[in-house]
Amino acid sequence: NIGTPVTLSVLRKGHAKALQFELLREDIQVESVETYDLSSSKQTVSYVRIKNFQIDTSRELKNKLGSLNMIDGVILDLRNNPGGLLEEAIRVSDLFLPGKKRIVSTKGTVVSSVHDAKQFFAAEHLLNIPLVLLINRGSASAAEIVAAALKQNERAIVIGEQSFGKGTVQTLWDLKDGSGLKLTIGEYLTPSGRSIHNIGVMPNLRLIPVTVPELKNGETELGRQEIFTTEKRFGLLS
């Protein structure tokens, strides 16, 4: 419960005795969207990383992009995004797609559904902005829904690796003993009607990952090199 203490025992390498730390439980809000300005003197390009799809991810993204006046291009990074809430994936896709464009459909053992763009946020300034989307083998589930929707509607150029390939709809049933039973009840289908399960989303342009040394701050030069190469390749920066 929030406000109650918890004691952690930490055994460090080279120490025979565990250290005790008392912490206070708190409700921690972690933002799922990060943005960076990659603009030149001529163009405004926004790099956006979505870590996962949680409550209000789409609104967070809309607000951050809306705070920039005149964006000339967006790089949407979904690498190592494990997924999350289906509704948020639909709304993120909706930000960049005009009304009635198919985003995803579900085919289930009991219930099936279709989800088309509805312009939830009426963000018309984002509909025609040049868009590059980055994926890799760690992009799964809801991240793949966004990638497939924007790729198959020819709204974004997808760059990177073939994605993970998790296209199942699951639900969790609570049992009387406090445990839970997770059941697969359907599958996601892309706008073209195809399943991505165990297949993934193929990028328009495949990049072969390489290992580079880490910098002191824990980041690598490769990330920024990939970003700027992407910008120049697709004309986001002149």
What are the functions of these language-model segments?
Residues 1, 5-24, 37:
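PDZ peptide-recognition modules
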Residues 17-20, 29-238:
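C-terminal "post-core" interaction segments
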